């Protein structure tokens, strides 16, 4: 009997500790110092995934090697359109990641002074941008302008997120709301950057008055200097493979880029479209046997695929 009472009291105290808001000391135990390696790694992975999804049906399809090369080479003041896009989405992803991690209380020394695990914390991209500039620099020329464009976009991407602090007497009613500014999901910001990529302005390399030139370019326009290479052809260094052998799609229910992919990837580049049936196997008709073992059939399917040759 004594054991049962002791056991019950132990469970009660444990539940109380879980349900009770964390003290500031307990809260800080979850935090770690700012690691640029960690933040950059998470941000660049998010940027690459978004880039490859956005350009899946384009002649330049954001190959991993080229993406890494564009991020690792020394800054150039004569970037092409794709250089500019990769730099912009990479910066946006890194700052977005840093902003959210700060607000969520993951990083020591930034974010709310209160317990962010119990109290909603506003996103502050301005502070994250300051940290980014301290670490990576502010850049000059086209690079500097485009970084300011990304910073302005992140500032415009704040929206109000509210939760009910004091419920009303009637179900579903709220007497008092608590609202904080949070960044839009990264996917929405990536769509804005993709539109900026399409609308980017090409500048001449020489200008009689660079200061006046930069002052006249709005902070919602990315700029680039050089024409893009011919992505139909294979790059001599292997950064992109050209469009020969690339798969295209004739799926009428897909996006406009997907529906036009055979035209843009094959015919415009001087290739023909080859159609072939490909045999694929997949698991199907799965069911649990004896309540714990998964048993499946193997279904064979013929799929029609299109490619450039």
From Swiss-Prot:
Flavoprotein recorded as keyword: no
Locations listed in the record: Secreted, Extracellular space, Extracellular matrix
Keyword terms of this UniProt record: Developmental protein, Disulfide bond, Extracellular matrix, Secreted, Signal, Wnt signaling pathway
Pfam families: wnt
GO BP annotation list: canonical Wnt signaling pathway; cell fate commitment; defense response to Gram-positive bacterium; germ cell migration; neuron differentiation; non-canonical Wnt signaling pathway; regulation of embryonic development; ventral furrow formation
Annotated Gene Ontology cellular component terms: extracellular matrix; extracellular region; extracellular space
UniProt family annotation: Belongs to the Wnt family.
Biological function: Binds as a ligand to a family of frizzled seven-transmembrane receptors and acts through a cascade of genes on the nucleus.
Protein name from the UniProt record: Wnt inhibitor of Dorsal protein
Organism: Drosophila melanogaster
């Amino acid at each position: 009997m004594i054991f049962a009472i002791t056991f019950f009291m132990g469970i009660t105290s444990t539940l109380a500790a879980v349900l009770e808001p964390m003290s500031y000391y307990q809260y800080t135990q979850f935090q770690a110092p700012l690691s640029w390696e960690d933040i950059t790694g998470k941000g660049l992975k998010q940027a690459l995934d978004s880039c490859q999804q956005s350009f899946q049906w384009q002649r330049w399809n954001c190959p991993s090697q080229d993406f890494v090369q564009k991020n690792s080479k020394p800054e150039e003041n004569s970037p092409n359109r794709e250089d500019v896009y990769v730099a912009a989405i990479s910066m946006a992803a890194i700052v977005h990641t840093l902003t959210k991690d700060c607000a969520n209380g993951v990083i020591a020394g930034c974010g709310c002074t209160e317990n962010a695990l119990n109290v909603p914390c506003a996103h502050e991209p301005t502070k994250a941008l300051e940290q980014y500039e301290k670490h990576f620099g502010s850049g000059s020329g086209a690079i500097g302008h485009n970084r300011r464009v990304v910073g302005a976009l992140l500032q415009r991407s704040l929206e109000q997120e509210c939760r009910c602090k004091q419920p009303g007497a009637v179900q579903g009613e709220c007497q008092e709301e608590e609202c904080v500014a949070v960044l839009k999901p990264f996917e929405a910001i990536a769509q804005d950057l993709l539109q900026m990529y399409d609308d980017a302005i090409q500048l001449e390399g020489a200008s009689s008055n660079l200061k006046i030139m930069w002052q006249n370019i709005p902070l919602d326009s990315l700029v680039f200097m050089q024409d893009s290479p011919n992505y139909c052809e294979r790059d001599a260094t292997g950064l992109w493979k050209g469009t020969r052998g690339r798969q295209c799609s004739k799926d009428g229910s897909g996006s406009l880029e997907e529906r036009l992919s055979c035209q843009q990837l094959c015919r415009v580049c001087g290739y023909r479209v080859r159609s072939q049936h490909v045999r694929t196997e997949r698991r199907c008709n799965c069911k649990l046997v004896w309540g714990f073992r998964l048993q499946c059939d193997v279904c064979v399917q013929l799929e029609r695929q299109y490619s450039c040759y």
